[in-house]
Amino acid sequence: DCKYGYDIHDGVMRLTLLRSPTFPNAADKGYHEFTYSFLPHKGTYREGQVQKHAYELNNPLEVIWGRGEKKETGCGSLIQCQTEGIFIETLKLAEDGNGYIARAYEGFGTRKKAEIVLMPGYKVSECNMLETDDTEIATDKNRFFTVFKPFEIKTFRITCKNIKC
């Protein structure tokens, strides 16, 4: 949803829901829906896990019912991060059709060693944002470690280890 902002002055909180100028064109006229949330918490935004709660609000979990037989154990996700403050922001098909692209970033402004887990049967390489210059990353039990600088964005290519994926 990401609307326009907020301000706090003299103990009064205000939320700007819509900015709709009429010049040069009637940009935002029409029907609008808003989702907003107040998250009281103690301590810093890190201690209050504000980014985590924001993701949960803007990307609610969807349950899809079905039947199937679990054949292999794993993390349940193609990729997931085990390190607080590292966020996997994007997962998409690679532009060249060779695997998937995951983008992750460090969101707390600190240097961090991240532990990332892959679903069994996949391998990973780090590439640039244009999805070129791949450098394969060694995994151990479907896990790998990488160091993020403050606010750094990293791009990973995830592909099958063999043709059966």
Where in the sequence are the language-model features?
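Terminal accessory/anchoring regions of large secretory-pathway or extracellular enzymes
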Residues: 1-165
